[in-house]
Amino acid sequence: MCPGLWGTCFWLWGSLLWLSIGRSGNVPPTTQPKCTDFQSANLLRGTNLKVQFLLFTPSDPGCGQLVEEDSDIRNSEFNASLGTKLIIHGFRALGTKPSWINKFIRALLRAADANVIAVDWVYGSTGMYFSAVENVVKLSLEISRFLSKLLELGVSESSIHIIGVSLGAHVGGMVGHFYKGQLGRITGLDPAGPEYTRASLEERLDSGDALFVEAIHTDTDNLGIRIPVGHVDYFVNGGQDQPGCPAFIHAGYSYLICDHMRAVHLYISALENTCPLMAFPCASYKAFLAGDCLDCFNPFLLSCPRIGLVERGGVKIEPLPKEVRVYLQTTSSAPYCVHHSLVEFNLKEKRKKDTSIEVTFLGNNVTSSVKITIPKDHLEGRGIIAHQNPHCQINQVKLKFHISSRVWRKDRTPIVGTFCTAPLPVNDSKKTVCIPEPVRLQVSMAVLRDLKMACV
């Protein structure tokens, strides 16, 4: 206080202010970009659309640089000569930042030399799902306007890769539609099903929205779309009921969201790990598990598609086929990848009833099992076994003959047959390994045999 001396007090404060301004001119400007985080909304104020575009770079993967105006982009670390990857999240019921986004951004920056931009539309995706759907067109227009600024800086349409999660996949599809399908790539991570399964091609993600469109389906019986929407559609574990996810509703929120979000975690794992998440074209998951689809010749000419950043998913054929359903199995936790093998058992004599044989691969303290059925009056039964160990680390196979507990008069006659296996894709007979001698199986008694398979 300056009691009774207001003029003196004013002069002192003015001098201090002048000194602070003058001294600040001697401090070199900071080179650190200002970091901006995702917005937080709530049910009362989260339905009105408010978009942020946040740029992340390898030099500071935890710092999102707000790039909305042309000047923001020019003054940022954005590199127009690199590819650009946009991440678009989906519906945010509680108005919170996606829990997976930081890990996703870091994985992308490590895996690709590219600009990574997260589209934050927490405001607009919160509250009721249907209000978020109503914001999709407006959001798509805002993203399209933002991309036009990047194109003015020299970015090519073909270098833009949109990765959309759930509802964000259809946002990406609409943006691609606005650019007449000339964007480089769109990846849909379990594209949303409600309101979109019967939507027109203009309203949802489809193969015409980019030069290459892929979708990973993990929750087709609940929150995800059940129809193919890309050039290649991965139906992981059949597209529903992912291993490790709760099977009963008493698990609460995890029961509702686990299958749906598995697509995100699979993609992150594909970015972080080298083991391939390879899939195989087939008419259905049931047919795939039955061993009816063993290679990728039709329609990919032997190049099996893989989840991840590999160009066009590893598909080399031209022109690209559309809406191809491909199937793969996974484990319950990261890195999720498995090796798929065909297993076959050929009976020496036909039987008048179905024959069930349990096949177990043993190697390095890891076991994998599958049951195959030989229909009555048939000699051959086959199936697909998924195993974590590479083929050359499978040391033994255990075979066990089962009979149905529902049959009153049980035929316990032993069976005799030959066992063979081959890693997928089965492109030639040279990969097939058979147990040299016929195997005699008695009911419920396990038989162990050595296996020697080459690494592939």
Curated annotation (Swiss-Prot):
Enzyme class per UniProt = hydrolase
The disulfide bonds in this chain are 245-258, 282-293, 296-304
Enzyme nomenclature, EC number: 3.1.1.111
| UniProt-annotated catalytic positions | 166 (nucleophile), 190 (charge relay system), 260 (charge relay system)
Recorded hits in SUPFAM superfamilies, A to Z, give: alpha/beta-Hydrolases
Q: Where in the cell is it found?
A: Secreted
Instruction: Enumerate the catalysed reactions.
Output: a 1,2-diacyl-sn-glycero-3-phospho-L-serine + H2O = a 2-acyl-sn-glycero-3-phospho-L-serine + a fatty acid + H(+); 1,2-di-(9Z)-octadecenoyl-sn-glycero-3-phospho-L-serine + H2O = 2-(9Z-octadecenoyl)-sn-glycero-3-phospho-L-serine + (9Z)-octadecenoate + H(+); 1-hexadecanoyl-2-(5Z,8Z,11Z,14Z-eicosatetraenoyl)-sn-glycero-3-phospho-L-serine + H2O = 2-(5Z,8Z,11Z,14Z)-eicosatetraenoyl-sn-glycero-3-phospho-L-serine + hexadecanoate + H(+); a 1-acyl-sn-glycero-3-phospho-L-serine + H2O = sn-glycero-3-phospho-L-serine + a fatty acid + H(+)
Keywords (A to Z) from UniProt: Disulfide bond, Glycoprotein, Hydrolase, Lipid degradation, Lipid metabolism, Secreted, Signal
Q: Where is the major localization of this protein?
A: secreted
| GO molecular function, a single term | phospholipase A1 activity
One cellular component term (GO) for this entry is: acrosomal membrane
- Residues annotated as glycosylated: 365
| UniProt signal peptide | 1-24
One GO BP annotation of this record: lipid catabolic process
Similarity comment text for this entry: Belongs to the AB hydrolase superfamily. Lipase family.
**Cross-referenced PANTHER family, in alphabetical order?**
LIPASE, PHOSPHOLIPASE A1 MEMBER A
User: Tell me, what does this protein do in biology?
Assistant: Hydrolyzes the ester bond of the acyl group attached at the sn-1 position of phosphatidylserines (phospholipase A1 activity) and 1-acyl-2-lysophosphatidylserines (lysophospholipase activity) in the pathway of phosphatidylserines acyl chain remodeling. Cleaves phosphatidylserines exposed on the outer leaflet of the plasma membrane of apoptotic cells producing 2-acyl-1-lysophosphatidylserines, which in turn enhance mast cell activation and histamine production.
Q: What is this protein called?
A: Phospholipase A1 member A
**Taxonomic lineage per UniProt?**
Eukaryota, Metazoa, Chordata, Craniata, Vertebrata
